[in-house]
Every structure is written in C-alpha cells, then in structure tokens.
Swiss-Prot record:
GO terms for cellular component: cytosol. InterPro entries: Aldolase_TIM, TIM_sf, TrioseP_Isoase_bac/euk, Triosephosphate_isomerase, Triosephosphate_isomerase_AS. GO terms for molecular function: triose-phosphate isomerase activity. One of its GO terms (biological process) is glycolytic process. This is Triosephosphate isomerase. It comes from Pseudomonas aeruginosa (strain ATCC 15692 / DSM 22644 / CIP 104116 / JCM 14847 / LMG 12228 / 1C / PRS 101 / PAO1). Transmembrane segments: none annotated. Belongs to the triosephosphate isomerase family. Pathway: Carbohydrate biosynthesis; gluconeogenesis; Carbohydrate degradation; glycolysis; D-glyceraldehyde 3-phosphate from glycerone phosphate: step 1/1. SUPFAM superfamilies: Triosephosphate isomerase (TIM). Pfam families: TIM. Keywords: Cytoplasm, Gluconeogenesis, Glycolysis, Isomerase. Homodimer.
Length: 251
C-alpha cells in the first residue's frame, strides 16, 4: 500500500521572521502517523527550516536544483549535491511556473531529475496542462509527453525512487480546483503509462495532486484510488490549514 505524502511548496514567500513563525506553528501540529509530510521553502531558508524542525517528522526539500549534480561554475544555481549536504531529502523538478515563466523544456527537466536522483534526492516530477490545452482536449497528451520525456531518458525504473505531482496549470494560484473525477482521470492515466513499462513500479509510485489544494477539498481528492496525497501551495503557508490537509490524507 502506498503511504500518503503531503508536501508544502512555499514558493517565493517568507522572511526570516515569518519563516520562524511558520516553523513554530508546524512544530505544534499533531500530524497523522501514517502520512509522510514535507515542506519546500525558498532556498535561502532551507537550513533555518531544517534546524527549526529538527526532531519533528517533517522532511525538508527544495523547489529547484541545477542540471549538474555537483557544485561548480554555474552562477545563481544550487547543485543537488549541495541540497543533499545540508539535509534536503527531495526536490521539485518541472514545476509549471518554471516551465512556463523560465522556459524549462522537457529535456532540461529530465536532466534535473537525473542530477537530483544521482545525489540521493527524491525528485518530485511536476506535470500538467494549461487551460488552453485542457479546452483543446490535450490534457492526457501533454501529461504523457512530460512523463514520457523522463521515461525515455532514464527508464521507467527511475520512478521507483521518485514522486509524480499532477498540477493542472489552470488551477494553480487561481482558487480553481480540478474535480476529484478530473484529477483521478489524469492520475489513472499516469499510472497506466508507467504500468505499460513496469507494473511493479507503477503500483508503488506515489502520485500527488497539486492545484489550489485546501483543507475543505482535500479529503475528497485524496479519496480517489490513484491520488496518494498533495503538493500544496498557498495553504502550506498556514500551519493550521496545512495540518488539516495532512490529517485529510491520513483519513
């Protein structure tokens, strides 16, 4: 049975003092024992969060890492080896904001996935369609292409040590949420694509839903058979709301 995972993506939010307050709130949460929980703060707060959450059952990850695994001459980037060194356990790759705003291609995303995994980090591969792509009936085609790029480059076995997050771009930061049925359709297609290559890998990989996840909608989403938790954006900046989402995953 797949163990649920709820990961909070703080995006480009926080100051030293506000992060300290959020850490305090997270430490006070009573988290369900059967759920893995992680937060992904901005890079410059990672060490603060790791130290602040020491002893609490919350993993810390990063929102991005470089295409090269080891440190070197790549100004402004952070090597996955450096993230592993400070105590990160996972990293987002291919988030839609980086694909759309910063122009990261499927090829770049695949390279980041490989680099992160080579350093012992768990890549959380983000896939999803824009509103225009959904309205054109291309949702499953787009997601299959994004997932297939990594499979073609690294083989399906790489997903035995990875997580996939489906995040419909039209639902991110908009307040809109895919219905449980819409989300399940895509999650089932992702698992089927993996199963076509390796049934055991497909059975074990955790698939998260991301896209304006709130406590009020979480339980119904997480009740779908192929949804194994959530990649939570804005709601993860509120400790109580985030805790409620984690409890929904445990129910």
């Amino acid at each position: 049975m797949r163990r649920p995972l709820v990961a909070g993506n703080w995006k480009m939010h926080g100051t030293h003092s506000s992060v300290a307050e959020l850490i305090k709130g997270l430490r006070q949460l009573a988290l369900p024992s059967g759920v893995d929980v992680a937060v992904m703060p901005p890079c410059l707060f990672i060490s603060q969060v790791i130290q602040g959450l020491a002893g609490k059952a919350i993993d810390v990850g990063a929102q991005n890492s470089a295409v090269e695994p080891m440190q070197g001459a790549l100004t402004g980037e952070t090597a996955p080896s450096q993230l592993a060194d400070v105590g990160c356990s996972m990293v987002l790759v291919g988030h839609s904001e980086r694909r759309l705003i910063l122009g990261e291609s499927d090829e770049v995303v695949s390279r980041k996935f490989a680099a992160a995994q080579s350093c012992g980090l768990v890549p959380v591969l983000c896939v999803g369609e824009t509103r225009a792509e959904r309205e054109a009936g291309k949702t499953l085609e787009v997601v299959a292409r994004q997932l297939g790029s990594v499979i073609d480059e690294l083989g399906v076995g790489a997903f035995a040590r990875a997580v996939v997050a489906y995040e419909p771009v039209w639902a991110i930061g908009t307040g809109l949420t895919a219905s449980p049925a819409q989300a399940q359709e895509v999650h089932a297609a992702i698992r089927a694509q993996l199963a076509a290559e390796n049934a055991e890998v497909a059975k074990g990989v955790r698939l998260l839903y991301g896209g304006s996840v709130k406590a009020a909608s979480a339980a119904e989403l997480f009740g779908m058979p192929d949804i194994d938790g959530g990649l939570v954006g804005g709601a993860s900046l509120n400790a109580d709301e985030f805790g409620a989402i984690c409890r929904a995953a445990g129910s």
